[in-house]
């Protein structure tokens, strides 16, 4: 006999009686005998709460604020002011890329990186079939839907966003 395993007494073991076991299937209905009253506690429905049930509310029915707290209002104002100005972009050619006469341009911070790529393609007189590969700080190629304000805030060098460009893939 293993002493580490608990011994089971008949009272603690599950009952083999199918009427008392729990199952995910409902037990078949048995005809009601004539000696049990129709409103016995076994057949009675579950009563509703006396205080009434709370109905679930969606977000549109939740509490509406008439004005924002002071710190939230200031945070929103700060975010709006970030993308309202212009950012400086410096184009840096990689080897074998054509060189621009003017390398520094200003672009609205609310513009997407796609706008910068289109502008660069126009300045380089690229055909529709030509490829232009752009890299921020010669490290990564941002997505075309990235905001210029966010890129400038995170990756600026001397208050300029350095965009290296090449006609062939330069990095990985």
Swiss-Prot record:
Cross-referenced Gene3D superfamilies: Phosphatidylinositol 3-kinase Catalytic Subunit, Chain A, domain 1
Subcellular location, principal: membrane
Region span, Disordered: 1-55
Cross-link Glycyl lysine isopeptide (Gly-Lys) (interchain with K-153 in atg5), where in sequence: 172
InterPro entries named among the record's database cross-references: Atg12 (IPR007242), Ubiquitin-like_domsf (IPR029071)
Signal peptide: none
Keywords: Autophagy, Isopeptide bond, Membrane, Protein transport, Transport, Ubl conjugation pathway
Keyword Membrane recorded: yes
UniProt GO MF annotations: Atg8-family ligase activity
Listed CDD domains: Ubl_ATG12
Residue ranges, compositional bias (Low complexity): 1-21
Top-level taxon of origin: Eukaryota
Database matches in Pfam families: APG12 (PF04110)
Protein's cellular compartments: Preautophagosomal structure membrane
The family this protein is said to belong to: Belongs to the ATG12 family.
PANTHER family, per database record: AUTOPHAGY PROTEIN 12, UBIQUITIN-LIKE PROTEIN ATG12
Subunit (UniProt): Forms a conjugate with atg5.
Protein name as it appears in the record: Ubiquitin-like protein ATG12
Organism: Penicillium rubens (strain ATCC 28089 / DSM 1075 / NRRL 1951 / Wisconsin 54-1255)
